[in-house]
Amino acid sequence: MESILRKDIWQIRSAHEGGGRKREMQEKKYTIRAMTTEDYPGLYALWMTIKGFGIRSLDDSQEGVERFLKRNPNSSVVAVASDGAIVGGILCGHDGRRGCLYHVCVREDYRRLGIGKAMVVHCMNALKAEGINKVSLIAFTRNDVGNAFWNTIGWTRRLDLNYYDFTLNEANITAFNQ
């Protein structure tokens, strides 16, 4: 894998050989950059392709994501293929004390190319630049692919905590992709 860091943009060339048999090497080019509000249609389209992905009716609406990006303008990221399609994304923000990653995803045919790790590094660097020293995320226990990813890149699964939430707006319904 060849990586070139230019300011805040990563251009990564990856050769990918799929399946258990030899195939013609296929080069997939992509760029990692800060997310903008204009990315929402492509990001939403990506979310809809991810099996088991939970979409919240208010928080994950265009208005909800725009509000999140306004509060956290420099830390969220997308991976964009050479054809302009969004193939990865992370909503990343902080409360002044701890960072949090939301909706970390990579399109299935772009996985295992280093995109996920490069996006996480981008987010962690953005958080460090804002004086944040710790970051967390939530991964569903049934998300085998995601949990394997976090273990592989060295994140610590906390067994000493319980996670609680409370829905303030009952209209903010979560629907899971099938």
Task: List the model feature ranges, each with a label.
Residues 102-105, 116:
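Mid-chain, well-packed structural core segment of small domains
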Residues 80, 104-111, 139-140:
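A short, internal acetyl-CoA/4′-phosphopantetheine-binding micro-motif in the GNAT/acyltransferase core
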Residues 30, 34-103, 122, 126, ...:
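Acetyl-CoA-dependent GNAT
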Residues 4-6, 10-12, 16-38, 170-178:
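Conserved N-terminal entry element of GNAT/NAT acetyltransferase domains
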Residues 112-125, 152:
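Conserved acetyl-CoA-binding loop-helix of GNAT-fold acetyltransferases
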Residues 127-139:
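Conserved GNAT acetyl-CoA-binding A-motif
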Residues 151-160:
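Conserved acetyl-CoA-binding loop of GNAT-fold acetyltransferases
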Residues 137-146, 165:
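Conserved beta-strand-loop-alpha-helix junction that forms the acyl-donor binding cleft
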